[in-house]
Amino acid sequence: MEITWLGHSAIKISGSKMIYIDPFLTGNPAASTTPDKIDCADIVVVTHDHGDHKGDSFQICMNTGATLVTIHEIAVEAQEKGITVEGMNIGGTVTVDGVKIHMVQAIHSAEKGDPAGVVIEMDGQTLYHAGDTALTYDMKLVGEFFHPDLSFLPIGDRYTMGVPSAVKAVEFSQSKKVIPIHYNTFPLVEADPVEFKKRVGDQAEVIILKPGESYTLE
């Protein structure tokens, strides 16, 4: 399974299915691609209705025929545009083409519907994308129920957890490997991933990627 960080919170997961999470590309100064270059996608996941997460999700779904998995209120909007959707809510699970997607708690705000994180099970791997969130004890449930092989955790502070809270989130979620996200896209979310890695220590393997770089999860 190949994991590519597209900048900000946008992730591409290439396995038996092609999955995009929070594909904010247009207007993203850190983006490593553009939506018009994406011609293959099976599932697009959106964690919440902020522009830097909902991003280009509708366009990608319309261009590729991908199924949009997201909170109910966004799903209703997308369905009205002819997009295939799987709407859900926190605590729920959907299965799309053999891929299990669980929606979990996030502490944040949103324009429409509630913010969320997601846990994705595919090809024998379990991935946790926290979305935009503060540190919350609910992350302990992610660890207890799912034991993620790889987690994507925001570290940019101000609008999400900063480095100290994200370090604790690694512990709570029992993450084996972590890719920091949602940092250094804009001046207001500047953070040092090296400092994050140092503070995590031997709790987990921290993988620092540049936008466009990939990591093979085995």
Predicted regions and their residues:
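Short gly/ser/thr-rich secondary-structure transition/capping motifs
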Residues: 1-5, 24-32, 84-85, 131-133, ...
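Active-site neighborhood of phospho(di)ester-bond hydrolases with catalytic His/Asp-centered motifs
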Residues: 21-22, 41-49, 68-72, 128-132, ...
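Pre-active-site segment of Zn-dependent metallo-hydrolases
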Residues: 10-50, 55-59, 73, 109-112, ...
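Binuclear metal-ion centers of metallo-dependent hydrolases, dominated by the metallo-beta-lactamase
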Residues: 79-92, 167-218
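Active-site-proximal loop/helix segments of hydrolase catalytic cores
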Residues: 16, 108-172
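Glycine/small-residue-rich loop that forms an oxyanion/phosphate-binding "nest" at active or ligand-binding sites
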Residues: 47, 55-112
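Active-site environment of divalent metal-dependent phosphoester hydrolases
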Residues: 27-28, 50-55, 75-78, 93-95, ...
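Zn-dependent metallo-beta-lactamase
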Residues: 1-18, 25-28, 95-98, 102, ...
